[in-house]
């Protein structure tokens, strides 16, 4: 296997959904680190205070993962990384040809938060309240792998499920983005939900009702990739809880997406669980990706 790719996780300021008395964003950081390093393809470091981070640190890495929301509560405005860090990250991808990964809620960006619009251009999409940002009703979600396949999704199930995840819909795709995974955002699930929207995650319902929400009854992107200048970006909005991390489809897809963002290529095959290897612990790679 090639020399390990150096991955940097930017984390540390999350909403109470991901940092409270029962769970911590550090669990996400640990799961991501374990999943990536167990492939044998990555060496991961985590920074919990990325505001003001400059190119002298960022440029040492091959790929940067964002696990950062910049606010304490859903109702609050986010405070971003700051100008120096924004400029360093944009150059890191666009000019230096490196990669970025936007994980789960970090993909959401409102116009009045102070993040540069260029991050949306990098991601190849916008996920915000005006575009229809909302969580689907809680429960099991059915995911579809988009055809034709990209090497990131080669060999994973055409249809699979996650349970207990925050399924964020309302993505406005930009030209050039390639969708990897979708879910059908069906009206029936909303109408049959015991409570929706939840009080901690308000949604402005149009006068015409839930059916008039943007993107209702359409396939909604949950993972996509985009070329940005000389570099690449991988965005994935699932991953709220450990159940998703245990799905073999996620175990195969996520490290490949990170590898593609870093290099533009996919070499990881996914864990082999045949024979005696079936006894290996999660995430099953044993550094033999």
Predicted regions and their residues:
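Extracellular ligand-binding/catalytic regions of CAZymes and related secreted enzymes
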Residues: 2-4, 31, 189, 198-289
